[in-house]
Amino acid sequence: MPHLIAVIQARTGSTRLPRKVLRELGGRPVLEWVVTAARESNVCDAIVVATTTEPGDGAVVDLAARLGVAAVRGPVDDVLTRFLMAADAAHAVSGDAVVRLTADCPLLDPMVIAECAAVFDPARTDYVTTDHEHTVAHGFDVEIVSVDALHAIDPVATGADRAHVTPYITLHPDDFRIASVALDPPSADLRVTLDEPADAELLDAIVAELGDRATSRRDVVALLRARPDLVALNAHVAVKPLAAG
């Protein structure tokens, strides 16, 4: 069986909501929610936080230590390099894979991570994603990419492909074996990530309704379908383009 390494990209230098990954949600830092989701998936053999060398991100390293997980520090905009550093820190070898998680998605469902892990097979897949058909809310996304694929794209990926790690793979489907995990019910019209103050308002409201522990994606979607007033809180927030980094 391949080793699965959860790599959580996190930094404090967000332009729209600075220090968002350290923000309290239900009494816990947002980053802690993501670490908890990775742990409760019961499929991750290691968890590594991939942050930057910026001075302010020392706070991310300190929080990772308090949570009992490793951290690596690398270039701000070259997230691919940070992921390779994280894989090395976890002693990844050929056949192992990285579960790509972002620290601004505190409502990640551990079961979705487990579903993706069940699909990943190094003999048949290089990349597993929940978002290949664009049916999942921004904030529930999970990706698994083989360490071999990361090393393969490292010499050729540039710009946004390095900042966002996996676009090169999806743009070259003839070169990589891609599998998609469909998540029902569809939720692409919803947004449960944390980029702006309006997102924080929605996440606070969801946690107030559902509790301060990890909840299932289905419970979150059901709540938002029943409460259009909550959906309206961040419906105006635009998705940041890939080129923005």
Where are these regions (language model features)?
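Short, well-formed alpha-helical segments that are part of the catalytic scaffolds
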Residues: 17-40
